[in-house]
């Protein structure tokens, strides 16, 4: 660990796979679930303290963004051994058709001929009289694979959630491997659940195949959750939540609040549940994008849908998420029959 974090460069990006690859339920509530346990093995991605709750479900999520250029998948489940629970989340994201323009420039200078060493030749800048060779345009792809494992350990009777994440990144002909840690906790104060998460603690590092090391800064999240009933409406519960993400790397140029390297972004969400069968969700994530979704659950399986309206002046559009949830016992019974 000392060798990993003792050298290398500090970067602002690298571990976003574990932030935006999430299930449809959390996404539709603006990812503001730091203090809200919503009974899914994916919940430990946002706060590892939730891995203490036993749940025998398998969750599968797929999302496609930017007209199919970016595709991601998430598979989540929990294993119970000797009265201890371990939650696992396996993540994948692929980005295809990334243009590589590095060899396109015909950098021959002002006279239009190579080898004359005139002004502008070989300077790497598109000068007057130079052009790009479209036949030399190439494309490459990026693939990221991640594993997030979470468990709970108590210290002096106070439980802490620990998340260990492993990231493998492949960009064109280069690859990297890294490891990071998250710490989370949950405290109930009267009728409000308060969740705290420290991500990438003490830092998360990636080691590339060329020997370079990229260290990522830690960040901090705090969230609150409250459940309430509406008078006159039976079997209907509303969950309200708010979240605040605090970063120290100045990586969000469009943060809601920023001062130097400090950035603060808020998010909130609502979930209405009727008879634990029908789910109605609204929210806004930390990118100020409106979110919403629906869910329906049967005895052994369910489906969640999320809609994210991207807040972008570039007109990149919106995208959708679908999550399928299955009872693990039901799946095993269908595969192997009752024993």
What are these regions (language model features)?
Residues 4-339:
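Subset of outer-membrane beta-barrel
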């Amino acid at each position: 660990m000392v060798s990993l974090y003792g050298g290398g460069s500090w970067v602002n990006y690298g571990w976003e796979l574990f932030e935006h690859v999430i299930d449809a339920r959390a996404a539709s509530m603006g990812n503001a679930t730091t203090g809200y346990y919503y009974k899914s093995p994916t919940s430990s991605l946002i706060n590892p303290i939730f891995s203490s709750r036993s749940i025998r479900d398998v969750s599968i999520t797929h999302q496609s963004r930017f007209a199919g250029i970016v595709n991601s998948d998430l598979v989540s489940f929990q294993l119970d051994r000797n009265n201890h629970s371990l939650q696992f989340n396996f993540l994948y994201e692929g980005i295809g058709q990334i243009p590589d323009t590095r060899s396109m420039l015909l950098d021959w200078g002002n006279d239009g001929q190579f080898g004359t060493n005139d002004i502008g030749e070989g300077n790497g800048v598109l000068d007057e009289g130079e052009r790009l060779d479209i036949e030399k345009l190439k494309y490459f792809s990026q693939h990221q694979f991640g594993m997030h494992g979470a468990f709970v350990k108590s210290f002096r009777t106070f439980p802490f959630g620990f998340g260990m994440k492993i990231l493998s990144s492949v960009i064109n002909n280069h690859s990297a491997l890294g490891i990071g840690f998250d710490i989370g906790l949950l405290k109930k104060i009267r009728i409000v659940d308060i969740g705290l998460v420290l991500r990438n603690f003490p830092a998360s590092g990636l080691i590339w195949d060329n020997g370079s090391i990229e260290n990522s800064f830690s960040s901090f999240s705090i969230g609150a959750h409250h459940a309430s009933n509406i008078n006159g409406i039976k079997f209907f519960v509303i969950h309200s939540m708010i979240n605040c993400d605090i970063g120290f790397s100045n990586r969000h140029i469009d943060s809601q609040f920023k001062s130097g390297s400090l950035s603060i972004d808020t998010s909130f969400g609502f979930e209405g549940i009727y008879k634990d069968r029908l789910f109605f969700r609204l929210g806004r994530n930390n990118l100020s994008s409106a979110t919403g979704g629906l869910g329906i659950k049967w005895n052994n399986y369910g489906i969640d849908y999320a809609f994210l309206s991207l807040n972008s002046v570039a007109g990149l559009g919106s995208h959708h998420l679908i999550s399928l949830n299955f009872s693990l016992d039901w799946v095993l019974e269908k595969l192997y029959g009752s024993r």
